[in-house]
């Protein structure tokens, strides 16, 4: 990295101050996310983006309840882009990516990471779903990377708000540590999803992922009032993802069947590997029971429309 950091001291101090028993690798990856966001701020890369996803939720809304591994964005004109003809939309997206990829290369170079602007190299870039979702990968080792995803057609229901994205060192008195390490981090200021939008997105993710990720349920479990979410808006959110997801009706019908059979919550993911906050396992299991009829209601509403 351009900033030569005593990683072992950093990880030890973070774990000591926050009382965490997680692997050093997870904390190191979290630091990389922070440094990448700081470079985004330095280069002004947030002007056309809206921040969303688990990293935003953890850092700015739930006081680092769990570690997140990716950086997820929506283009700020996505509501407009989704209404354009495919050819016009692709031209607009290409124009943005042609400018963004070289800047992302600068971010990687400044941190001693590996990235290629060659969009035909699928190791570094995947173009998904009719060229409306771009996934970039910045490698910090041979096979390990930070994923940066930009969705160009996400429909936003709530107006985004500007935030300063927090780092884990904002949650304890880290001045001495930062000075000792010579570590200077400028928080990334960017338009971001509101908590209401994140709740809708989490419900949508729970019902439209091919495989259930327990982290989505855990996030809703910790968000106060998430069980009072607007069912109609959740169904709309699912419907609006048709530009990205294929066979939505079959997918939702299958999820409804699993809910009715009490087979919906099977997941290979272990939330305890990512969770920072202490939580009551019985309460989490009870939450799954409470959210089941809400998820079924969303499915039924979607299938009726």
Predicted regions and their residues:
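Structured mid-to-C-terminal alpha-helical surface segments
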Residues: 1-49, 59-65, 75-305
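Glycine-rich beta-strand-to-loop/alpha-helix junction loops that act as flexible
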Residues: 51-55
